[in-house]
């Protein structure tokens, strides 16, 4: 009898929990009948798995295509365990980005905070974010066209590109390389030099890179902190990187002025940031400079590898620039300004590749925009890829056509937000473009290439080439 009562009590508790789960999931639908059309999916899971299902990054994916056709370009869903408004509309996206901290606020999932740290520029809010971003902008502005920075980019690009010659010494001999790995080597070497003043061959650089790779894997993993999981390894890797950076900071302080002119020198001269904020700033700089730049370069190589006509136009542009320079003379800021078609290619690769698909925001109050009501506290996802691939805004939207940028604005606009927008526009976006252009200069003047097999950029939603973008490279007979 007692056993039966216990079973009955357990069933009642279980049913109560299930009822609570169902009510908490669907109650926002009942309380907000004027929210945009849409669906919430199953309790607990919502529609997150479908939203995150992998698809080619130059497509919307089945989830967005289905929901946009059924509900329109703005709809409600239940994503990341939260009632959500998804915007695929350029005007609403612009409105959201421009009203940061007034109507909307950055709202990344809590596990991201655990990896990046509470002082990361990606997750801090209000005045703290403004202070960190102003410092980042000042550093980027002073660095962007500095001869020493441009020289460092070129030396590293020459080192990477030159290393391939050793693998295929005979003219005409084809060699296959995993290009994404090479792009990451280049991007990491550049950013670690600019931020910490470290050269690629220093042992501490290799140590930071090893930890950084573990950090990156965990950043995009399931947030389960159990020893051995990618997430746990990422948290541990961040702690090791922080310890290494703190050691470098202490060494600089003890040695006095280093005159290296890197980001760290500027950080150490600032009294506005705590040591923890300085370490987080270094990590943010490494993350942005490494992942964004390497992916951008890989996208450019991928799309040019499929367009012989555009590749030839880029090659001619760089041959013209190189013909006006001495044999071993480095590129200058004036040379960069002449890379006009290269800029068209970079912008088109960003538009088609969609390195940043969407960002996380939260409504701070009930927001009415045109016919839409966005309820207070709901997550808001402005989807940039949906605007980039909208055929009404970009003709033949899924086609790689750099010529569409001729005579057009080269910067961020309502219909082109590859690095976000508003007060949270990525401060290092211009550095990524400079580095991509300089790397491309030496690539097109020294090699011809083609994609080896089928490999496409996939959105998970983070973007990745499944096979690491293997390319067949062949040295050109006339090297520059």
Swiss-Prot record:
Induction: Down-regulated by brassinolide in wild-type and the dwarf11 mutant. CDD domains: CYP90-like (cd11043). Keywords: Brassinosteroid biosynthesis, Heme, Iron, Lipid biosynthesis, Lipid metabolism, Membrane, Metal-binding, Monooxygenase, Oxidoreductase, Steroid biosynthesis, Transmembrane, Transmembrane helix. One of its GO terms (cellular component) is membrane. Heme binds at residue 426. Pfam families: p450 (PF00067). This is Cytochrome P450 724B1.
């Amino acid at each position: 009898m007692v056993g039966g009562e216990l079973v009955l009590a357990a069933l009642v508790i279980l049913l109560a929990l299930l009822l609570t789960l169902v009510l908490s999931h669907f109650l926002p639908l009942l309380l907000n009948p004027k929210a945009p059309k849409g669906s919430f999916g199953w309790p607990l899971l919502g529609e997150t798995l479908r939203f995150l299902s992998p698809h080619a990054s130059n497509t919307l994916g089945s989830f967005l295509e289905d929901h946009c056709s059924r509900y329109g370009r703005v709809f409600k869903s239940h994503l990341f365990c939260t009632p959500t408004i998804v915007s695929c509309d350029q005007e609403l996206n612009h409105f959201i980005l421009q009203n940061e901290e007034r109507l909307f606020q950055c709202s990344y999932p809590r596990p991201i905070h655990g990896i990046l740290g509470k002082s990361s520029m990606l997750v801090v809010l209000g005045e703290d974010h403004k202070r960190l971003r102003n410092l980042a902008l000042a550093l980027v502005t002073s660095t962007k066209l500095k001869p020493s920075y441009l020289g460092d980019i070129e030396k590293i690009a020459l080192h990477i590109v030159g290393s391939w010659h050793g693998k295929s010494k005979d003219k005409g001999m084809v060699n296959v390389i995993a290009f994404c790995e090479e792009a990451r080597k280049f991007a990491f070497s550049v950013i670690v030099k600019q931020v910490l003043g470290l050269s690629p061959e220093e042992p501490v650089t290799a140590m930071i890179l090893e930890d950084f790779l573990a950090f990156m894997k965990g950043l995009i993993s399931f947030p389960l902190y159990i020893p051995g999981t990618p997430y746990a390894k990422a948290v541990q890797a961040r702690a090791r990187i922080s310890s290494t950076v703190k050691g470098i900071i202490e060494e600089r302080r003890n040695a006095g002025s280093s005159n290296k002119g890197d980001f760290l020198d500027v950080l150490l001269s600032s009294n506005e940031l705590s040591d923890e904020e300085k370490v987080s700033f270094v990590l943010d700089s490494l993350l942005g400079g490494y992942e964004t730049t390497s992916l951008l370069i890989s996208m450019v190589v991928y799309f040019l590898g499929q367009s012989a006509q555009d590749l030839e136009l880029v090659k001619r542009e760089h041959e013209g620039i190189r013909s006006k320079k001495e044999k071993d003379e480095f590129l200058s800021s004036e040379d960069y300004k002449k890379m006009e078609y290269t800029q068209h290619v970079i912008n088109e690769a960003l538009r088609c590749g969609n390195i940043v698909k969407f960002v996380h925001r939260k409504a701070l109050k009930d927001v009415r925009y045109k016919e839409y009501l966005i309820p207070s506290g709901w997550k808001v996802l402005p989807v940039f890829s949906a605007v980039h691939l909208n055929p009404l805004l970009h003709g033949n939207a899924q086609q790689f056509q750099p010529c569409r940028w001729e005579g057009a604005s080269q910067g961020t606009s309502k219909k082109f937000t590859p690095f976000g927008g508003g007060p949270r526009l990525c401060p290092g976006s211009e550095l990524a473009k400079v580095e991509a252009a300089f790397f491309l200069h030496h690539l097109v003047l020294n090699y011809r290439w083609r994609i080896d097999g089928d490999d496409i950029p996939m959105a998970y939603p983070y973007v990745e080439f499944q096979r690491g973008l293997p390319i067949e490279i062949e040295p050109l007979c006339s090297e520059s």
